[in-house]
Amino acid sequence: MTDNLQNPPRETAVPVLRAGVFMLGAVASFTLMAVAGRQVSFELDTFEIMMFRSFVGLAVVMAFVLVQGRLHELPTRKTGTHLLRNIFHFTGQNLWFFAITMIPLAQVFALEFTTPLWVLILSPLMLGERMTRMRVIAAVLGFVGILIVARPTPETLNIGTAAAAACAIGFAGTYIFAKRLTRTESLACILFYMTVMQAVFGLICAGFDGDIALPSAQSLPWLVAIGICGLTAHFCITSALSLAPATLVSPIDFMRLPVIAIVGLLVYGEAVSIYVFVGAILIFGANYLNLWSETRKS
C-alpha cells in the first residue's frame, strides 16, 4: 500500500509526463513564432505574414494528409462553420502579429491568456451553454487581471495593447467554432480548411492595395518557422490534452509568460513591468478556477 502511494503506477505517470513534454513543445513553438513574427515584420505587413504562413502550413498539412492516406477526410458539409472559425482566427492572428511589433512580448502573451475567459463569456451566446456563478467569478477576476496588465491610462494605453486584448476575442471565437467542428470533423480536415481559407484571406487582404511584398532570403526561414510553429503548437496542445486533464496541462502553458519575458529581455532588451506578472497570475488563477470547477462537476 505504502509503495503504491509513493510510486504512482507507471501507466498513470507516463501519460502525464508525455503531456508535459508536449506542452514544453507548445511553449517553445509559441515563443519561436513570436520572435519570428517580429523579425519578418520589418519587411512584411501582417496580411502578408498570414498569407505566406498559410502557404507554408498548407504544404505541411498536405504532406501529412498524403503520407497518412487521409485524403478521404477532407470533404466537408460544414463549410460555413469552417468559414466562421477562420474569420475569427485570421482576425485574431493578425491582431496578434500586429501587437508583438508594438508592445513587449510578455505583455502580449499575458493579454492573450484571457482567451479562455472570452470563451466562457461567448459560449452562452454561441453554444447555448449556461453561465454559472463560478464562471461569472472567474470572468470578473480575469478582467481585473486585464486592467492590471494594461493599466488603461492615457499614458499607458495604446493601439498595441488594444490589439493584444482584442486578439484574445478572435482566438475565443476560434475555439468555440472548433468545438463545434470536432464533433464531426477530423483534425486533418480542420487544419486543411484553416490553411486554405486563411491563405485566400491573406492573399485578398495583402493584395488589396495592389502591392504584395515578397520575402527576402533573410526573412524566408523566419516565415517557414512561423508556418511550422503555428501547426506544431496546436498539435502539441491537442496531444497533451488527450493524455492528461486540462487542470494539469494549463499550468504548464502558463510557462510561456516567463519564457517570453526572458527572451524579450535578452533579444530585444524589453524591460517587463511587475504589473504584467501580477495581472497574468490573476488571469491564470481565474482560468484555473473555472477549469477546476468544470472538472469537479464532470
Where are each of the predicted segments found?
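C-terminal transmembrane-helix exit sites in multi-pass transporters
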Residues: 98, 115-137, 258-277
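Structural signature of hydrophobic alpha-helical transmembrane segments
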Residues: 45-59, 97-115, 157-170, 216-230, ...
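Hydrophobic/small/kink-forming positions within alpha-helical transmembrane segments
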Residues: 27-35, 62, 86-94, 116-121, ...
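C-terminal-most transmembrane helix of multi-pass membrane proteins
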Residues: 3-4, 258-298
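Helix-helix packing/entry segments at the starts of transmembrane helices
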Residues: 108-114, 181-196, 234-265
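Transmembrane alpha-helical segments that form core, pore/gating elements
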Residues: 35-38, 46-47, 61, 154-215, ...
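Membrane-interface interhelical linkers
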Residues: 1-25, 58-84, 133, 196-224, ...
